[in-house]
Amino acid sequence: MVSFEIDRNEPFTAFLFFRKDSREAADALLEELRSKKGKMTEREMADFVRTLTSGERGFKFSKQNFYNKVLGTFRFFGFIAKVPTNDPSRRRTILAYRVVTQPVLQRRPIKPSFLYLANEIGRWWNDLMVTE
């Protein structure tokens, strides 16, 4: 039987990734995004991936796996988006990865339902990543 309860004591990445190395890379990405207020340029992301491939964070993770598996999963589910952003230092528009605020209903849907699960996951993501 499927459980319709979300255990918030587990890390958010355990919900999306089953492999330990993917979870570690995803946790490192979320930590990096939090430290940069939810936005990273392509260059900052490339520097971050270099630290993963070199093993500076205590584990190694390949560039291809990171972009395809970890970042691809976050982008597929709509948690992270690649958006045009103004760069005042260069006086031009560049692409940056940004945390996406998930839409959450004011009134919780009845459970068990898919809408209930989607609402709870969105609320969990917003509590974890979105800082106003």
Set out the residue ranges of the language-model regions.
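Short, amphipathic alpha-helical interaction segments positioned at domain boundaries
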Residues: 98-132
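Short alpha-helical segments that sit at the start of domains
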Residues: 2-39
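Short acidic, hydrophobic short linear motifs in intrinsically disordered regions
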Residues: 38-58
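Surface-exposed polar/charged interaction patches
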Residues: 36-39, 55, 77, 127, ...
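A short, conserved structural fragment
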Residues: 72-86
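Short, Lys/Arg-rich nucleic-acid/phosphate-binding segment
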Residues: 84-95
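Short, hydrophobic-biased segments on the C-terminal half of alpha helices
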Residues: 63-72
